[in-house]
Each structure stands twice: as C-alpha cells, then as structure tokens.
Curated annotation (Swiss-Prot):
Family: Belongs to the sulfotransferase 1 family.
Subcellular location: Cytoplasm
GO cellular component: cytoplasm
Keyword list, A-Z: Cytoplasm, Lipid metabolism, Steroid metabolism, Transferase
Highest taxon, organism lineage: Eukaryota
Annotated protein name in UniProt: Phenol sulfotransferase
Length: 18
C-alpha cells in the first residue's frame, strides 16, 4: 500500500541521511 511504501522510503531516507 502507499502508506507501507512511504514508511519504508522514510525509514531508508532517515538511515541514509544519518
């Protein structure tokens, strides 16, 4: 679903940023 994908993207983005 969109929310599941979005959450995953956010998780990866935060990890990459950190």
């Amino acid at each position: 679903s969109f929310f599941e994908q979005n959450x995953k993207i956010v998780y990866v983005a935060r990890n990459a940023k950190d």
